[in-house]
């Protein structure tokens, strides 16, 4: 999920058996399954509606960076297929070879052979996305430039900030998108009290940890896209449901979400940025 330039502890974490259980569909938990069919689905389809007219009908090309075990991309392909939108190709990348292998198995298990042929998963780091993809796909940079309609990253962009490589990642996203293409980023909200370590820090029960210090603000998530000339369509806080929540907690929080949004939206769990590449690309 995160960058290969992060400390060795993260490489160990995201190449472990526990990572496979956490980031694949059968064992990931009820919360993420609920979100993929509700909160996340809603923002995905809203972002896709911002594509140039006729794009969905002519065949979408999708890319998810930091895709983990692939469950998000696989589910999105299924949703689009059921909704009548054609998917020409879907590509997932992650720095963890273990999770990339798991994603390939997941696609074979959950998708028909015809749909599975349209998916591919590759080992690639967020901050060197284009060059790693070129290497993995045995292709040329020119073939990837301006080739994707929709690029998304879920709970992964903060690791680029941690490595101070967020501009490199955003620049590669810009290059990969077609003019008018859309990027969507969902990640942890630094203002949320419900992240355990962050809560302990705010209550002065422990000193700030490296993870506390590395969760960007909404403005910081947005900044690299603004700097590179994207049109920022949405940048906001949303979602009160943890990925790991059980069924009961999930439905309680879902029912409370309208009230929580009304009184404390900035404290919700996720930051959302939706940015579109201009039809006429600015100088960068």
Q: Where are the regions that the model predicts?
A:
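Conserved class I S-adenosyl-L-methionine
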Residues: 1-56, 75, 184-205
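Class I SAM-dependent methyltransferase "Motif I" SAM/SAH-binding loop
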Residues: 66-70
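Class I SAM-dependent methyltransferase SAM/SAH-binding core
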Residues: 71-132
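A conserved beta-strand element that flanks and buttresses the S-adenosyl-L-methionine
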Residues: 152
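A short glycine-rich, Lys/Arg-flanked "PGG" loop and its adjoining helix->strand segment in the class I
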Residues: 167-179
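Acceptor-substrate binding/catalytic loop of class I
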Residues: 204-219
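A C-terminal cap/extension of S-adenosyl-L-methionine-dependent methyltransferases
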Residues: 234-284
């Amino acid at each position: 999920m995160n960058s290969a330039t992060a400390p060795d502890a993260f490489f160990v974490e995201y190449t472990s058996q526990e990572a496979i259980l956490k980031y694949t569909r059968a064992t990931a938990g009820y919360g993420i399954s609920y979100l993929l069919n509700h909160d996340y689905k809603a923002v995905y389809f809203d972002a896709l509606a911002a594509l140039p007219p006729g794009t969905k009908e002519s065949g979408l090309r999708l890319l998810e960076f930091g895709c983990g075990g692939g469950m998000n991309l696989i589910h999105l392909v299924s949703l689009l297929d059921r909704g009548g939108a054609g998917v020409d190709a879907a590509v997932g990348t992650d720095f963890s070879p273990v999770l990339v292998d798991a994603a390939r198995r997941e696609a074979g298990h959950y998708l028909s052979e015809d749909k599975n042929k349209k998916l591919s998963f590759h080992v690639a780091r967020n901050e060197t996305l284009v060059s790693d993809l070129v290497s993995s796909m045995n292709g040329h940079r020119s073939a990837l430039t301006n080739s994707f309609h929709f690029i998304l990253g879920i709970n992964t962009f903060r690791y680029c900030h941690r490595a101070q490589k967020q501009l490199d990642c955003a620049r590669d996203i810009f290059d990969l998108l077609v003019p008018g293409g859309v990027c969507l980023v969902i990640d942890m909200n630094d203002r949320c009290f419900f992240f355990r370590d962050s809560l302990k820090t705010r209550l002065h029960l422990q000193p700030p940890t490296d993870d506390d210090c590395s969760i960007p603000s909404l403005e910081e998530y947005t900044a690299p896209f603004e700097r590179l000339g994207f049109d920022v369509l949405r940048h906001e806080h949303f979602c009160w449901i943890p990925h790991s929540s059980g069924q009961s907690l999930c439905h309680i929080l879902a029912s409370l979400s309208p009230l929580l949004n009304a009184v404390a939206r900035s404290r919700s769990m996720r930051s959302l940025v939706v940015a579109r590449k201009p039809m006429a690309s600015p100088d960068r």
